Amino acid sequence: RDNYDQMSKAAAKIIAKQVKNKPDSVLGLATGFTPIGVYRELVRMHKEEGLSFKDVKAFTLYEYLGEGFDIIKPYGLDKSCARYMHEEFFKHVDIKKENIHYFDGYTEDPAKTCDEYEEAIKNAGGIDLQLLGIGRDGHWGFNEPGSSLGSRCHLVGLTKQTLDDNYEDFYRKVGITRDEMPHFCLTMGVGTILEAKKLIMLASGTKKASIVKEALEGPITSHITASAIQLYGGEVTVILDKDAASELSNIDHILHLEKLSKKYNLRAE
């Protein structure tokens, strides 16, 4: 896609189609900068086109340990993934509160919480469609470099790269010190993600270009957990803007296939 807006709308269109075809879909939802445009487009579709989420179940992809929905704090200071999803998406659509699932970031027993989250996904029938980004170090969810590609929901320590990114992108701007920011995260595992029936992976900007190339064209390795996308056997859609796609060696071929696919209404790989 030419730009972030086009990327976001393309992803939202796929999610909307999923929800229309299966109103009780189970969605796995990522947070961060990249998917904000997707959620805003889905909100627009809900308000202007009547897209309903009333029977949808939603599972957030991860949550920072020690963070949780705190409505008392201003949104800029509450950096929990639960608050993000509420402010950017859930409060604007008709999804039922009981169908929204978050990791409990305040848990005193992370292992138990992760097991319960895994079980809740299973009891819901599994994830129908999982929305993902990719970290600058290639992490999927918060499965940092070295995480097992067969991992289930688990607690992970954040790497220096992720901590630096989080500090510069979020915490420094609101006066939170490095010592005060979260250093651990509860996340769906790579194995959990790979069991979703459909995947959408998004990436935007030149800062993601090299890691996108490594994940899609390089070896499958636990050092770049997003490279596990190459193992995925279901329906996967990777949506990149021009900047994020700029280092792919086969970009001309991909663009050619995209044009042919649109012309003949085919899905090419």
Go through each PLM region and give its residues.
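N-terminal glycine-/serine-/threonine-rich phosphate-binding loop
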Residues: R1-L27, R44-K47
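Class I SAM-dependent methyltransferase SAM-binding "motif I" and its flanking Rossmann-like core
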Residues: G141-M188
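A short secondary-structure junction signal
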Residues: K112-D115, W140-S147, S151-C153, I211-A215, ...
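Short beta-strand segments
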Residues: G28-G32, F59-L61, F103-D104, L131-I134, ...
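A glycine-rich beta-strand to alpha-helix segment
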Residues: G28-V38, A120-P145, E269
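ATP/nucleoside-binding phosphotransfer catalytic cores, i.e., glycine-rich phosphate-binding loops
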Residues: M188-G191, E195-E269
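Active-site histidine-anchored catalytic micro-motif
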Residues: Y39-R40, R44, E48-F69, G126-L129, ...
